A protein has these predicted regions:
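Long, compositionally biased intrinsically disordered regions
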Residues: 282, 290-291, 296-301
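Intein-associated homing endonuclease modules of the LAGLIDADG/DOD-type, together
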Residues: 28, 38, 43-53, 58-290, ...
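Short, solvent-exposed loop/turn positions at domain surfaces
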Residues: 32-36
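Short, basic/aromatic beta-hairpin or loop at an interaction surface
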Residues: 22-31
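Phosphate/NTP-binding elements of NTP-utilizing enzymes
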Residues: 1-22
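Short, solvent-exposed coil/turn segments
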Residues: 6, 24, 64-66
């Protein structure tokens, strides 16, 4: 926890009692359609409240210039606020009794460690209820293609040794598409809708509209439409991701998703958080054929999101 060198204009957004106080104008506020800057919030706007539901902004109160602190949580996430910002927390004693308390940041800074342990903790984010959106590609299929699929060239394909996954993908393909086996574990998704040179199938057009078609593994990401989709769609998306590039840790308490794309790893962590789970992103460098590549590892711990 450290004070940011600069002093920023801050604002208070009126929400339920015991929350908020002051955050920088550039702070991100989650809305049903994604994040916006705190400074753009107006009375009547809809935001995601602390319980994961949609709430209406009742008031916006500029706080002037204040010292701003940066708080880092154990999963690596960070936020900035004034020392008057109120937090719903549990202390070491509270965690034993199940009680909660509301304290300002100034109080936490003075005793945030006790007996070499972190004194304060906050709950995981509850399941966030974004509005339902019309998705052109089934979220499981998109998740699988983002993990172990290829759409860099005109041939859209994926790899798997699991015939059950192949059968599932066949059932959720867009109309007039089929799965063609190219090699032992390699499959291609073929469009039968139209013919002729330059013809594009629905799946390719959808990937182009999402800004994904033509991307290499290093540049993959989850489009906002899917990041902020309804609960069931996000679960299906996560299932596709984990079925492709996921694995279960040896102790059975966590799942691990592996990607060379830092943006995709960060997006997967956001999906897990939005489902009420815990996720942390760790990086590790590995050497392949004398060329050093950086791979990003995402550890998803005790998320319970696909149940």
């Amino acid at each position: 926890q450290g004070t940011i060198d600069d002093i920023y204009d801050t604002v208070c957004v009126s929400m339920p009692p015991g929350t908020g106080k002051a955050q920088p104008l550039y702070s991100k506020v989650l809305t049903p359609d994604g994040f916006v800057e705190m400074g753009s919030i107006k009375v009547g706007d809809k935001v995601i409240s602390g319980n994961g539901n949609v709430a209406k902004v009742l008031g916006v109160y500029p706080q002037g210039e204040k010292d701003i602190y940066e708080i880092t949580l154990d999963d690596g996430s960070k936020c900035r606020c004034s020392d008057e910002h109120l937090w719903k927390v549990q202390t070491i004693e509270d965690r034993k009794s199940g009680k909660y308390r509301i304290v300002d940041l100034k109080s936490m800074v003075n005793n945030y460690r006790r007996n070499l342990q972190s004194n304060y903790s906050i709950d995981y984010i509850p399941k966030i209820n974004f509005s339902e959106k019309k998705l052109e590609i089934h979220p499981y299929l998109l998740g699988y293609l983002l993990g172990d699929g290829c759409f860099k060239t005109k041939n859209i394909g994926f790899a798997t040794a699991d015939i059950e996954i192949v059968e599932k993908i066949k059932k959720i393909l867009p109309d007039n598409h089929e799965v063609v086996k190219d090699a032992k574990y390699n499959y291609r998704i073929k469009s039968n809708n139209g013919s002729g040179r330059g013809h594009k199938g629905i799946l390719r057009l959808s990937l182009e509209n999402l800004g994904l078609f033509g991307l290499s593994s290093h540049n993959k990401f989850i489009p906002d439409m899917y990041l902020y989709s309804d609960h069931e769609s996000r679960i299906e998306l996560l299932r596709g991701l984990l079925d492709s590039d996921g694995s279960v840790c040896s102790n059975g308490t966590a799942a691990e998703f592996t990607s060379i794309s830092k943006k995709l790893a960060s997006d997967v962590a956001d999906i897990v958080h939005s489902l009420g789970g815990y996720a942390s992103v760790n990086t590790k460098k590995i050497s392949r054929r004398e060329k050093e590549n950086e791979k990003t590892y995402l550890n998803v711990k005790n998320y319970g999101a696909t149940r």
